[in-house]
């Protein structure tokens, strides 16, 4: 139940932020999805350390399941990132599509690491 409720909250947050970014950014780069995924990676890195979560127990408690799997799972979007890249490729912007995918993965890894390091420093 908590995962479903959290997923709804996260999805609404993704929609809201994507809409706001879309009102101000009109370029070809899918900035909304990029910012959503990077911020989600930062938050999950931070909270996983704060909650003391490892890979095997991240689905365990209601708090972990509701926040990490539910909210952040609904908020971030791997499938939209892939669709954005396909759309760019179909528009003849294959180079931008590759840049977007590489930048998303590397920035996401860095953001998750940074979130985890910040949580370690505070704890």
UniProtKB/Swiss-Prot annotation:
Positions with a binding annotation for Na(+): 73, 76
Pfam family, one: CRCB
Catalytically driven reaction(s): fluoride(in) = fluoride(out)
Regulation: Na(+) is not transported, but it plays an essential structural role and its presence is essential for fluoride channel function.
Coiled coil: none
Cell membrane keyword on record: yes
Cell cycle listed as a keyword: no
Function per UniProt: Fluoride-specific ion channel. Important for reducing fluoride concentration in the cell, thus reducing its toxicity.
This protein's name: Fluoride-specific ion channel FluC 1
Native species: Brucella melitensis biotype 1 (strain ATCC 23456 / CCUG 17765 / NCTC 10094 / 16M)
């Amino acid at each position: 139940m908590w995962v479903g409720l959290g997923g709804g909250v996260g999805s609404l947050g993704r929609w809201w932020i994507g809409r706001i970014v879309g009102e101000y950014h009109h370029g070809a780069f899918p900035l909304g999805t990029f910012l959503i995924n990077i911020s989600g990676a930062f938050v999950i890195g931070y909270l996983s350390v704060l909650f003391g979560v490892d890979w095997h127990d991240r689905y365990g408690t209601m708090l972990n399941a509701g926040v990490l799997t539910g909210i952040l799972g609904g908020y971030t979007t791997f499938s939209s990132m892939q669709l954005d890249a396909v759309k760019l490729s179909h528009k003849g912007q294959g180079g931008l599509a590759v840049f977007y995918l590489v930048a998303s993965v590397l920035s996401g890894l860095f953001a998750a690491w940074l979130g985890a390091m910040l949580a370690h420093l505070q704890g």
